[in-house]
Design a protein with these regions (language model features):
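Short beta-strand segments that buttress and anchor functional surface loops
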Residues: 72-76, 160-165
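Cyclic nucleotide-binding regulatory module and flanking cytosolic helices
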Residues: 196-214
Length: 214
């Protein structure tokens, strides 16, 4: 018997998350904020095509079960990162391509009656912004990075558990369960272009993770 499950993170920038020098690019109309993603994730590829988010990590996996034991397991799913469009009003605009990082997938761990999967995907957005740094020159032009690490446990009885175990310092990471329902909202940082020394956020309940059940 094959059991399949998935967990998805969507990362986006709300209007209240950008402050300081970088806010001018958004308020001028050259850049755009993101509308909140839907509460129910029906078609991730279509949301990506329409530019509704900056980044998504979809961890999908399967486990083959025989006599109550997991005998084989594997991954599906992928990461999505959107282009960045800079508008020049009536003169048009320019679309900048992001840089995708290699997908990091741990080998499925088979533990008798369950299997554990872990996936990290992300990238660097297409347009650099001024970011404050310690010491001279006090600002650097750097494109923000965005990534999440998701974990999925599939059990032989057909149940599963999903976790957001770590994430980059990006304003919003929303987590969707196997059925596409919004399961958690993580506000990791108010400004994606803030202090470069804040490399990651670890949020949630016990152990610093966001955990929910399927």
């Amino acid at each position: 018997m094959r059991i399949e499950a998935a967990v998805t993170s969507i990362s986006w920038i709300p209007s209240e998350a950008v402050t300081g020098l970088t806010k001018a690019g958004f308020t001028s109309g050259a850049m755009h904020y993101d509308d909140p993603p839907p509460d129910y994730l029906e078609d991730l590829a279509e949301l990506h095509k329409s530019g509704r988010f900056r980044f998504a990590n979809r961890l999908a996996a399967w486990a083959e079960v025989e006599d109550g034991q997991v005998v084989d397991a594997g991954y599906a799913g992928r990461g999505y990162i959107s282009t960045t469009r800079v508008s020049f009003g009536a003169r048009g605009g320019v679309t900048f391509q992001p840089t995708e990082f290699p997908e990091l997938r741990a080998e499925p761990e088979l533990h008798g009656d369950h299997a554990v999967f872990s996936q990290t995907v992300g990238g660097r957005t297409g347009v650099p912004f001024p970011r404050p740094v310690r010491g001279k020159p006090f600002f650097q032009w750097v494109a923000p990075t965005v990534w999440t690490t998701l974990q999925l446990v599939i059990r032989a009885d057909g149940t599963f558990t999903s976790e957001l175990t770590s994430a980059s310092k990006f304003p919003r990471h929303w987590i969707y369960d196997n059925d596409g329902r919004l399961a958690a909202r993580e506000n990791c940082l108010d400004d994606p272009f803030a202090d470069e020394h804040l490399q990651a956020c670890h949020r949630g309940g016990a152990g610093g993770v966001v955990r929910f059940h399927g």
